[in-house]
Amino acid sequence: MSASSPNRRRILSLWLPRLPIDRIKRKLSGSSDALGNTPSVVVAKQHNAILIHSLDDLAVRAGLSIGLPLANARAICPELTVFDADEVADRKTLDDIADWCDRFTPLVALDPPYGLFLDITGCAHLFGDERALLQIVSGALAHRGFTVSAAIAS
């Protein structure tokens, strides 16, 4: 069965691995105290420890990683900007992105905490082809400040 077969579903998978920090940076982007060149992380309490939950590129380049205790992160990078995790706000942001994706297909499903599935069966030709649709969606999300990984499969 070919990829264009009417019986084969085509799914565009979107993964937003840095949704928590991207959401915060988008919120702060218009303020005068924008983060600039300061490494930033989102932390969450797990088993009586405060751990990095999400981080930006600057924090990665500074040697930080998801799961690292905040105390260790501050020792590595004293100028670190820290935000508390907010799962409700992250979920609302994912819901908002899903609503935005309705412009590409009426069949959008959440894959929490940071993913979406778009059933693009029969829709891709409206945007050129599957490759063009993938580039349009991922490019538009990147332009809006989100780190995104995307793939299409059956």
Briefly describe each language-model feature range:
Residues 123-127:
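Short, charged/polar, Gly/Pro-enriched secondary-structure boundary elements
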Residues 1-117, 131-139, 143, 148-152:
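Residues that scaffold, gate, or flank divalent-cation-dependent active/transport sites
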